């Protein structure tokens, strides 16, 4: 692994499925090197997570919310690219000391090999009824008067019914 590590600058709205936490994983799967238990076309999820999401998606649609996954499974290599990109930005563009840059990055992102996205159980979602914008996962977009506030309130009330927990 490279000595530098970078993360996404925008915030993650992570959701994790409890059901998968009871499953045993191989080390390669745990750290994002290899995962064969994934389903989906362009967006990959662990099979139980996928099925739970589909149920939640149907329920949300009945309430006028169009759940759209903007990030799901990503392997070690993709996480490393993200980490390195953020690290470069913080140290080269913002001129942060390496330790300070890392501390800033880990506020919202994880070091490659430690991301729950490696498991295919975490998803970042938005309400697809609203046009995509830059940095869709910023906290303020999920707060009162934010474009995804209705989604946040719906998830607060309903996500655990489907085995998802906001993080």
Where are these regions (language model features)?
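Bacterial Sec-dependent N-terminal signal peptides
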Residues: 1-26
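Extracytoplasmic cell-surface/polysaccharide-interacting catalytic and binding patches
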Residues: 18-167
């Amino acid at each position: 692994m490279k000595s530098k590590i970078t993360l996404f600058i925008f915030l993650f709205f992570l959701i994790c499925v409890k059901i998968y936490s009871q499953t045993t994983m191989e080390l390669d799967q745990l750290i994002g090197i290899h995962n064969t238990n994934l389903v989906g076309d362009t967006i990959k999820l662990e099979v139980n997570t996928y099925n739970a999401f589909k149920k939640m998606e149907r329920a949300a649609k009945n309430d006028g919310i169009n759940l759209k996954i903007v990030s799901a499974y990503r392997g070690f290599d993709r996480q490393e690219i993200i980490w390195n990109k953020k690290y470069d930005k913080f140290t080269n563009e913002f001129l942060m000391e390496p330790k300070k840059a890392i501390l800033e990055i880990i506020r919202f992102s994880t070091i490659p090999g430690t991301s729950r996205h490696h498991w295919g159980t975490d998803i970042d979602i938005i309400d697809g009824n609203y046009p995509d914008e830059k940095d869709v996962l910023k906290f303020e977009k999920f707060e009162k008067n934010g474009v995804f506030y209705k989604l946040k309130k719906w998830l607060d009330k309903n996500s655990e019914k489907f085995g998802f927990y906001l993080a």
